[in-house]
């Protein structure tokens, strides 16, 4: 039996800073599992690098979430339609104005 490498999460290895209001809003947004994972992946790819938005491909989202790229695209489209994510061309980010988020379609 092969031994698994011990992995320990440590702030010294990096962290993603997020406003409590944003975290609470996403918990109350009623997202599907895929939508939540895509939201978190976008958060990691943007806020995790101290950026408000960035070019993030469906393949990058797929690598982070384990979801197929076309399913990442579908989840991302719903999040953009609801105003939870913003998208201009290929650049995507999180809409911090949580009062603009629409409820379930």
Question: For the regions a protein language model found, what residue spans apply to each?
Answer:
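An N-terminal low-complexity regulatory-tail signal and nearby short nucleic-acid-interaction modules
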Residues: 1-20, 86, 102
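Alpha-helical structural motif
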Residues: 18, 34-35
């Amino acid at each position: 039996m092969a031994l698994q490498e011990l992995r320990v999460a440590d702030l010294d290895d990096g962290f993603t800073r997020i406003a409590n209001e944003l975290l609470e809003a996403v918990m109350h947004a009623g997202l599907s599992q895929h939508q939540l994972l895509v939201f978190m992946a976008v958060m990691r790819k943007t806020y995790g690098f101290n950026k408000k938005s960035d070019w993030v491909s469906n393949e990058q989202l797929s690598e982070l979430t384990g979801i197929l790229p076309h399913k990442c695209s579908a989840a991302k489209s719903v999040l953009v339609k609801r105003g939870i994510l913003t998208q201009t061309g290929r650049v995507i980010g999180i809409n911090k104005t949580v009062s603009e988020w629409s409820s379930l379609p």
